[in-house]
Design a protein with these regions (language model features):
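Short, charged beta-turn/beta-strand-edge "cap" motif at the junction between a beta-strand
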Residues: 52-61
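Compositionally biased, charged N-terminal/linker segments
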Residues: 1-48, 57, 145-146, 155-156
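Surface-exposed, flexible loop/turn segments at secondary-structure boundaries
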Residues: 13, 60, 75
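A generic structural signal for short beta-strands and their flanking turns/coil linkers
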Residues: 4, 26-29, 48-50, 63-65, ...
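Aromatic- and Lys/Arg-enriched surface recognition patch
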Residues: 66-136
Length: 156
């Protein structure tokens, strides 16, 4: 299957690119996604080797680097822990509702690319992220969009 590309959002105060970079083996599971469409992307579509744009959301939304999918979708165990912020009493190990993937740090951009700057790039005019009202935390991007953003960011 051909490589696909994704944008994954995270609040930098919760989990930043530096956190991924500092994980053992620079790898971590992407848990806590509680939107059905984003869940379906992770469960059904993401494959090992797919490229990821790591996006810091919040007060200063910006793309900060890249990662790779290193494990396909599997049940998100945080949904089963009542002490976890992502707990969902309807999800069980026997009937999981939520899924996650594992990603591995790949690169940090020399300069983060703010959302506002992305809006000014003609090659990105159709990007899902830039559509009004889009709040998905995981979304597909085209190879052209991925390559354009990586080129803009430059690797450290």
């Amino acid at each position: 299957m051909a490589t696909r590309y994704w944008l994954m959002k995270s609040e930098p105060g919760e989990y930043a690119l530096d956190d991924l970079k500092n994980e053992p083996d620079q790898t971590e599971h992407w848990d806590g996604v509680r939107n059905y469409q984003a869940r379906n992307f992770m469960r059904d579509d993401m494959q090992v080797g797919d490229g990821v744009l790591f996006y810091h959301s919040g007060k200063k939304p910006e793309v900060v680097g890249t990662a790779r999918v290193v494990r396909t979708g599997y049940p998100d165990h945080t949904a089963w822990d009542p002490k976890n912020n992502h707990f969902d009493p309807k999800s069980t190990p026997e009937n999981p509702i939520w899924f996650m993937v594992d990603i591995k740090f790949e690169s940090e951009f020399k300069a983060p690319i703010p959302l506002k700057a992305l809006r000014d790039v003609a090659a990105l005019k159709d990007m899902i992220l830039l559509r009004r009202g889009n709040r998905l935390s995981v979304m597909p991007v085209t190879k052209k969009e991925f390559d354009t953003i990586v080129k803009l960011g430059g690797k450290k």
